[in-house]
Every structure is written in structure tokens, then in C-alpha cells.
């Protein structure tokens, strides 16, 4: 089975083209593939298929709202093998792969996901690099919109706002947090949060207050741990930072350890613009891949 390896601001993925959705994935196979010692290593896996093929193969029970059979479908799995609704960095890499491989000839097209359709605009593309904007849909503040939820990260307690970006986020902006303190946080330590409020877990962003139109953040993704970037997390961070200033709309640059992205929040949707890099192409050893399925 052929693969590509790519990243969006160092949030890295294994891309598996499987247009007819013929390959059966187990959580153990995905986890092994993403393991940085046992497999190729990645924050997640992007299966490239169509929505219609995914339904026919049983990957989807039904088409997500707004997604048609002919749309491309990003079947995204976290590094632990669990299924995820959406990944903003993953969509950019997914779109880059489609254009660079010749599977898609248009610069503007729809990528389906469990969170619904995502319109992408590929501003530049070559075999190595791409610049992609993703319409991420409306990001919704949950609850009162104020910092109503608490979490302990790296031994430090933060208050945050819950944001739905097609997947759940807890964005914690601390006006007193310095860049040095942000860098020193141990995001590998156990995270303590209210499991009643977030029974399925939540992605957690810790961010500074905006300065000159920029916020800086780190992220702990559910099912993965700390990653160098999280696309939906940068959207959630922008929503939280704007809300702290009493604004519902605006544009911010969000700096993560893996680089910068630009987030625009409007009354009706949100946009994520950033880079994608395809670093490798290869072929998985069938004997290894299918031995993992047999061992489950």
C-alpha cells in the first residue's frame, strides 16, 4: 500500500490513498503506523477516499450533512487509532496531496469530513509545498462564552472557554502568562479536567493574550498528547482571544511551535490559512501491515 508523509505546521500525518475505501483499518494498525519507533510515526492518519465509497464500504453509516457522494472524504484517525471528526491541519495536507498527486485538478473543492463539508482553496501548490485556506465553518462558543471551565495542565490551573470547531476544544487564555512560562509548561504531564463536562475528552489550548495581532499557543490533543500544531485548535484560540477583547469577529495570526497560521473569524464562518509540506512517498510492507490486523 502506497503512502505519503506530510505536515501542516509540523502537525504530521501519514496519507493513505484508498479512493475506493477497499482497505480495512483497525485501531491497532493505525496506532502502530503512527508509532514513531514501531511504524512511520505521525500525529494521525488521513485516508483519501470519496464520501460515496466510504458509505458503500461501511466506513460511514451515512453521508454527513452537506457532503455529497462525489466529494472527497478525509477519513481521519488519531494516533491512538480513534476516529476524529475534523483536523484543520490535516485538511490542508489532504488537499495538498490531492492536487500534487493529480487526483484533483481544481484549486477550489470540497473535502468531506465527519464534521461536514470543508471548502478548500489551494493558493499555491507544487510537489513539496502548498498554501491552503480551509473554510472551517462556524466556530461556536459554548455556555456563557466566558472562562467557565477549569483544567490543570503541567501542574498549573487554567480557566478556559469551550469552543466547538466540529470537534471540542477548551481554549485557555491567561493574560498573565509569559512566553517563557508558556514554553516551560509540561504538556506531557497528566491533564486534569471535568469529565462530566467533557465525557469524551477535549482538545486543550493554552495561549497568551494577543499582542500586535498575534497570539502564541501550545496544544494537548485528545487521543494524541501534545502536538506541534492543531488547526482546529488555532481557530478555537482565535475565538477565545477575540472574545476576551469583546470581539466576535477579526483576524489573528496564531503562532504554534510548528509555525504560524492566519485565522479569520466572521459572523458566519471561520477560515484557516497555512502551509502544507509533503516530505516523503513510499510503500508500506504488506506483510507488516496485515500482520497487525491478524494480531488484533
From Swiss-Prot:
<keyword id="KW-0457">Lysine biosynthesis</keyword>
<comment type="similarity">
    <text>Belongs to the diaminopimelate epimerase family.</text>
</comment>
<comment type="function">
    <text>Catalyzes the stereoinversion of LL-2,6-diaminopimelate (L,L-DAP) to meso-diaminopimelate (meso-DAP), a precursor of L-lysine and an essential component of the bacterial peptidoglycan.</text>
</comment>
<dbReference type="InterPro" id="IPR018510">
    <property type="entry name" value="DAP_epimerase_AS"/>
</dbReference>
<dbReference type="GO" id="GO:0008837">
    <property type="term" value="F:diaminopimelate epimerase activity"/>
</dbReference>
<feature type="binding site">
    <location>
        <begin position="221"/>
        <end position="222"/>
    </location>
    <ligand>
        <name>substrate</name>
    </ligand>
</feature>
<protein>
    <recommendedName>
        <fullName>Diaminopimelate epimerase</fullName>
        <ecNumber>5.1.1.7</ecNumber>
    </recommendedName>
</protein>
<feature type="binding site">
    <location>
        <position position="203"/>
    </location>
    <ligand>
        <name>substrate</name>
    </ligand>
</feature>
<feature type="binding site">
    <location>
        <begin position="231"/>
        <end position="232"/>
    </location>
    <ligand>
        <name>substrate</name>
    </ligand>
</feature>
<feature type="site" description="Could be important to modulate the pK values of the two catalytic cysteine residues">
    <location>
        <position position="221"/>
    </location>
</feature>
<feature type="binding site">
    <location>
        <begin position="88"/>
        <end position="89"/>
    </location>
    <ligand>
        <name>substrate</name>
    </ligand>
</feature>
<keyword id="KW-0963">Cytoplasm</keyword>
<feature type="active site" description="Proton acceptor">
    <location>
        <position position="230"/>
    </location>
</feature>
<comment type="subunit">
    <text>Homodimer.</text>
</comment>
<dbReference type="Pfam" id="PF01678">
    <property type="entry name" value="DAP_epimerase"/>
</dbReference>
<feature type="site" description="Could be important to modulate the pK values of the two catalytic cysteine residues">
    <location>
        <position position="169"/>
    </location>
</feature>
<keyword id="KW-0413">Isomerase</keyword>
<feature type="binding site">
    <location>
        <position position="11"/>
    </location>
    <ligand>
        <name>substrate</name>
    </ligand>
</feature>
<dbReference type="InterPro" id="IPR001653">
    <property type="entry name" value="DAP_epimerase_DapF"/>
</dbReference>
<feature type="binding site">
    <location>
        <position position="167"/>
    </location>
    <ligand>
        <name>substrate</name>
    </ligand>
</feature>
<keyword id="KW-0028">Amino-acid biosynthesis</keyword>
<feature type="binding site">
    <location>
        <position position="78"/>
    </location>
    <ligand>
        <name>substrate</name>
    </ligand>
</feature>
<comment type="pathway">
    <text>Amino-acid biosynthesis; L-lysine biosynthesis via DAP pathway; DL-2,6-diaminopimelate from LL-2,6-diaminopimelate: step 1/1.</text>
</comment>
<dbReference type="GO" id="GO:0005829">
    <property type="term" value="C:cytosol"/>
</dbReference>
<feature type="active site" description="Proton donor">
    <location>
        <position position="87"/>
    </location>
</feature>
<dbReference type="GO" id="GO:0009089">
    <property type="term" value="P:lysine biosynthetic process via diaminopimelate"/>
</dbReference>
Amino acid at each position: 500500500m502506497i503512502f505519503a508523509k506530510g505536515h501542516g505546521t509540523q502537525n504530521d500525518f501519514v496519507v493513505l490513498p484508498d479512493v475506493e475505501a477497499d482497505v480495512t483499518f483497525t485501531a491497532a494498525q493505525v496506532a502502530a503506523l503512527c508509532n514513531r519507533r514501531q511504524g512511520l510515526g505521525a500525529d494521525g492518519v488521513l485516508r483519501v477516499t470519496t464520501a460515496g465509497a466510504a458509505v458503500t464500504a461501511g466506513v460511514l453509516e451515512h453521508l454527513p450533512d452537506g457532503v455529497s457522494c462525489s466529494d472527497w472524504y478525509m477519513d481521519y484517525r488519531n494516533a491512538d487509532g480513534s476516529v476524529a471528526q475534523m483536523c484543520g491541519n490535516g485538511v490542508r495536507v489532504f488537499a495538498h496531496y490531492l492536487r500534487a498527486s493529480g487526483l484533483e485538478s481544481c484549486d477550489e473543492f470540497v473535502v468531506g469530513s465527519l464534521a461536514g463539508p470543508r471548502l478548500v482553496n489551494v493558493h499555491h501548490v507544487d510537489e513539496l509545498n502548498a498554501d491552503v485556506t480551509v473554510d472551517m465553518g462556524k466556530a461556536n462558543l459554548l455556555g456563557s462564552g466566558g472562562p467557565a471551565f477549569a483544567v490543570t495542565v503541567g501542574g498549573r490551573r487554567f480557566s478556559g472557554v469551550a469552543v466547538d470547531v466540529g470537534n471540542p476544544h477548551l481554549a485557555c487564555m491567561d493574560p498573565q502568562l509569559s512566553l517563557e512560562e508558556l514554553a516551560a509548561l509540561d504538556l506531557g504531564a497528566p491533564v486534569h479536567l471535568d469529565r462530566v463536562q467533557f465525557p469524551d475528552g477535549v482538545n486543550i489550548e493554552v495561549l497568551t493574550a494577543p499582542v500586535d495581532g498575534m497570539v502564541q499557543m501550545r496544544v494537548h490533543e485528545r487521543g494524541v498528547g501534545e502536538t506541534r500544531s492543531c488547526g482546529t485548535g488555532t481557530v478555537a484560540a482565535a475565538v477565545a482571544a477575540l472574545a476576551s477583547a469583546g470581539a466576535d469577529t477579526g483576524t489573528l495570526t496564531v503562532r504554534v511551535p510548528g509555525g504560524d497560521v492566519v485565522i479569520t473569524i466572521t459572523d458566519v464562518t471561520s477560515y484557516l490559512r497555512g502551509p502544507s509540506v509533503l516530505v516523503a512517498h513510499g510503500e508500506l510492507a504488506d506483510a507488516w501491515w496485515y500482520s497487525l490486523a491478524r494480531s488484533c
